Regions:
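A structural micro-motif at secondary-structure boundaries
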Residues: 1-24, 84-93
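A conserved catalytic-core signature of glycosyltransferases
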Residues: 4, 32, 80
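Positively charged, aromatic-enriched patches within helix-turn-helix-type DNA-binding elements
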Residues: 13-18, 24-61, 68, 73
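A beta-hairpin/wing motif
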Residues: 77-85
Length: 93
């Protein structure tokens, strides 16, 4: 369960606060589940959200951080292309 207003993801009984930039990545990937979003598109979305240049390595660091928080099974890598959210998404409320 994801609370889009407070950047909190509930995984089982655990509530996990997701930093804003990482949450931007998660919500972007969840908008098109099971479809690859290119690295360059994700960098673009982050740059638009934060109004400054984002280095490619910064994206890699955020993806690694998300995987540490949630587990490897949620975000998958499409090698040399980008990433995709590997779970079905249902919006409630």
């Amino acid at each position: 369960l994801i609370d889009m207003d407070s950047n909190i993801i509930q995984k089982g009984k655990e509530k996990i606060f997701i930093p804003k930039a990482s949450f931007t990545i998660i919500s972007t990937l969840m908008d098109v589940p099971h479809k690859t979003v290119s690295r360059s598109a994700l960098v673009f979305y982050l740059e638009q959200a934060y109004h400054h240049e984002i280095l490619d390595n910064t994206l890699t660091v955020h993806i690694a951080s998300i995987r540490r928080l949630l587990g490897d099974e949620y975000i998958k890598t499409h090698k040399t292309v980008g990433y995709f959210w590997d779970f079905d998404v249902f919006k409630v409320g």
